[in-house]
């Protein structure tokens, strides 16, 4: 066996990665979790359960829906359709093919169903199996997720955003005194199921409890209690305690003394011990709970109260006559003075009454007596009448309806989460499998509600993240699936009942179209399925990590109040407090924090390090908001000694409710993992975030997502250390799939021979086809560039190619430029930006934008449209860029109005002239009448054609251009196949050589003789095929050769088969939309240089528009002659309070000056003035310990490293744990600069120094997607609105500029009457006047007449619609 790791001299690429000087102090014990795993886990792991054997699938996602819907039986129970298993076929097209052909990337879902037919004996009713049929049924195509967590739907990349919604369960709250004028708090409870009817319970102003179902009319809560089967006695016994009053002759009543029921008050009568007769307190004296406890402790068990005390109390059981057992008063009735007389007359010794006092109000008892329903039947009928008004109420229907509402698992589902929340809130212990309401639930909800009213317990905070959960992709699609399958179930039952079941197969019963349409509708039109923001890799990642409170089942913008949008203490480490849109969606759309993840119940968890006995361990525990409330959590920057023990007397900790307290170190349970866990990915890319005002940080994180990928990428000198993670997880860069050695590299692809050998010992080959100048969703350019060279050894997950906006495996959204903060002739007024001509000349901020144009040749009523070069009435000059088929060449430079694809459409028949009749009579065939319908470049677009794609309908003959494109693609596929085969062959034959050399020949081709010993020279004389003809004496060697041959042939066949499949796909034609014969797509790339009007921004929310481009010689320059690139306004800082940008500028200034210093040292080393030790010493001083592994290498490698940082030293200053002001000063000193970071600047125009020192430094600036080229527009001739006949507005409608009300005032103020008249008539909507004016311009005359504007006629018509006839009458005078 040959080891492939032999002779690897190349260094692993990971040494190629950029080293940053890191200012962080906190050691990271947890890596940032994969940034898009929220999408992938939810869909692939939890919903589809792809790549999991059928037997090992858990009952969740698709499996659980199919299990819950099936089995389906018909009404007579003769046929029964059961679910066995499901699996996915391979998708017809891969991701790339789908996006090119405008198809959806989906896999066919095959479900195995079993249909059982039963025979039912009509006399006995027994059932016997008549037959069982099992069949695999196609249930439609299910969209698959790409490796980057997106979906391809009709050729466009889409993202399904996760939704935040209220967790199922029970919630208690009050109206904050807003409903009733007295400001009284009205408490209410609401049971929110995952699906099913909502149940509300509420108090009114009179303290009566009501309930309502699905916001319908309210009923007494006791009606609900009776409906679940409770009698009056059970209700009273469940909600109240009872106390017995015993008669003491001639003295009054003795009653048990309960100190808990005593509140502080003045006694109205003496407090007398019933057992001893002692007076403990006199009337008028004050009793307190403390005093009551003291008396109780001293043996006070019963007290004596006056006879009249019973008046106003409520009976806790029926009052009966001792002699006849006749009921005198019902349970719950109030004791009146008359009733007390009866009690005395009948000498009743014991009276049981309810304990009702300020701690336990009479609400349930009052509701009972207000409620007219006295039994279960009446209560059920009452509920039925509210929910089904107008239908006759009978007890059976009412019972069914009530059961179906809350107790039927088909219609009501609390979900596992809802059951857990319900159990914990109501202190119940019901199994998690019970996901419907139970009688205990309802009884206890009323109990907790009453306790809240009595002042026990607290209301729920609905914005607490323990009460809001996340529905990710998998769950959202699962809900759609359920809807589709429920609809399908109905159609299956109908089909079972309709036909002869004996002859039917499962596929005859299932109509997959119902399911497909529901899923398709969700992906195409749902508010949560969104067109992916693909401006740059950061915007992609952020979009996938977004949490929206909007969407179906969520909030709506108009109704969301301030509380929902606000930052909540539980957001800490879960939802970013910074990143959210400005405008009406603020706070409703959020971003997940960097380290957060979503647990199986849908709650967001944040990681913490466990603290045991003051000792901070490396154990990382993820806690949800609910669990977090139980612990004391310290901050990540708490002081820790070298043994990992917390230092200091007290530690600042977070406790329940988001409050901060100082606790002793041994009481701390956890500390944060890193300060960065608070913010989102975008915010964690802002260096010195801690020095910025929150509003500006918000703008900064939002604007990074709008940065356009530039031609030349450049990672920031001042970063945060997260740049690499973002580039890797976004999928923009290409990662190596296995360890291996680079065999071939060019700009289009990388071929790597892997080192992970197969079972047969042969290597596999990874071929990475790079994306070249592809269009993104936002018309920016996706282009990948290789980072490796032939012979490089790469490790798994190394970055081997950069994508858009990445530089050496780090995200690079903008460029490092030299800025000066200085007012310059008013050109940087109000955040304007002044730039040097160098920036434009050297393409520093130049970006490429790609637009796609499509033309479809259809089959029309009058005949097919044709793509051709032969277009009527078009000059040869206009056709110069088209090939013989009529499609533009790749590489052609085009501008607005040029023809991209020539197309003609048949014209309708016009009346035939006599001459034509004659011609037709002579020649028979009429000259075919066509009109030009070519695709032209729209206005405002110019550029170079970079790609053309031609799609032809199956069965339609392909044109030459389509064949040429197809040939090119086949050649590419063949090259991939041949290269892979070549690498495998090279390996196989070198292995064969090693086996054969030294063996004795038994038989072989003509050139060799039996008995010879094989040498390498002999083998060189043989062709590759002749190797297999050799037979040698050693049987073991022959066996091995036989095995190699088998494996080699298998590999070769597999490659050929794969090639053949792909070629067949290319040649077979395309599935085009209805009626389309041919589709041509043309891609035009435009270079956008920076120009006045373009918007730029830094990472700190400092945005501005370019006001002027100044020649280099006029720009301010440094004393060494370096010209400043950009001049910014210093007044943009103080009021905005984003000081982070100044610290960034200073550190950037240190960065380039340190780089200059390193370059000088290298120069001196090369001139032999200094040794390598001085360079090492300087690098050690600069980078610290983490550079040791480079300093231990050879001198050449150290110099090579120094050359890499010759442009600027890269820093990492992590969020909230980065460089302090002193660190920045230290770096400036090390670079030999003034610690103030300010320098003398010279004015380029006068050559004189500016009066004061100026802050100058390297700053990272971004070019945003708001380009002036796409905004500015003017109209000459264009469309008019149908009703008002005024020109349309806006660039997309090619509209005009509105001359509005205020503009009219301006003309009126100047008295420019004629100008005003023409503005309001012929230049706008006087139709006849417009035509006449056009005529007079054509004739060269200068006069015009204005008539009545069309909008005046519209107004008159509106008057008439109001029955007012307004006429314009011209009188003769």
Swiss-Prot record:
Q: Which GO terms describe its molecular function?
A: DNA binding; DNA-directed RNA polymerase activity; ribonucleoside binding
- A cellular component term (GO) from this record? DNA-directed RNA polymerase complex
Q: What's its EC? A: 2.7.7.6
Give the reaction(s) catalysed. Answer: RNA(n) + a ribonucleoside 5'-triphosphate = RNA(n+1) + diphosphate
Q: Which SUPFAM superfamilies match?
A: beta and beta-prime subunits of DNA dependent RNA-polymerase (SSF64484)
Q: Name one GO biological process term.
A: DNA-templated transcription
What keywords does the record list, in alphabetical order?
A: DNA-directed RNA polymerase, Nucleotidyltransferase, Transcription, Transferase
Enzyme's top EC category:
transferase
- Family under the similarity heading: Belongs to the RNA polymerase beta chain family.
The subunit structure is: The RNAP catalytic core consists of 2 alpha, 1 beta, 1 beta' and 1 omega subunit. When a sigma factor is associated with the core the holoenzyme is formed, which can initiate transcription.
Task: Describe the function of this protein.
Answer: DNA-dependent RNA polymerase catalyzes the transcription of DNA into RNA using the four ribonucleoside triphosphates as substrates.
Which NCBIfam families does the record match to this protein? PRK00405.1, rpoB
- Protein name per Swiss-Prot or TrEMBL: DNA-directed RNA polymerase subunit beta
Organism name: Rickettsia felis (strain ATCC VR-1525 / URRWXCal2) (Rickettsia azadi)
Q: Top-down, what is the taxonomic lineage of the species of origin? A: Bacteria, Pseudomonadati, Pseudomonadota, Alphaproteobacteria, Rickettsiales
